[in-house]
């Protein structure tokens, strides 16, 4: 899978600067976020965010929220307008296909800041 990013602005970093993996999304929940607790007791919410582009096109970005952000997203319904800040991450998982198990890679945004954008 290829991940393409359109940037409105790019800056050259100082050679001593640490790498930055940061993304800001402004969009709408496509479906009710799924809130749950992991076996380790961590709170998590799966969110599918529609980020609108011009010409009536939207990008659908899978996001995960943790802790208080997960609890908050669990109260949101479909169509909630939110601003979300986080980092892009990838993770491996196994998918059973018939008798076989295939290794897959998922790309998602792990959010560390979420805000309801009141109109």
What kind of region is each of these model predictions?
Residues 2-119:
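Single-stranded nucleic acid-binding surfaces, predominantly the OB-fold ssDNA-binding core
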């Amino acid at each position: 899978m290829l991940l393409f990013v359109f940037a409105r602005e790019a800056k050259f970093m100082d050679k001593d600067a640490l790498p930055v993996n940061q993304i800001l999304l402004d969009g709408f929940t496509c479906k009710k976020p799924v809130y749950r607790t992991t076996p380790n007791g961590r709170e998590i919410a799966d969110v599918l965010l529609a980020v609108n582009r011009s010409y009536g096109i939207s990008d659908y970005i899978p996001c995960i929220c943790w802790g208080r952000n997960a609890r908050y997203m669990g109260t949101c319904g479909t169509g909630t307008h939110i601003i979300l800040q986080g980092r892009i991450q990838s993770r491996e998982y196994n998918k059973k296909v018939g008798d076989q198990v295939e290794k897959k890679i998922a790309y998602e945004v792990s959010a560390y800041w979420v805000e309801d954008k009141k109109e």
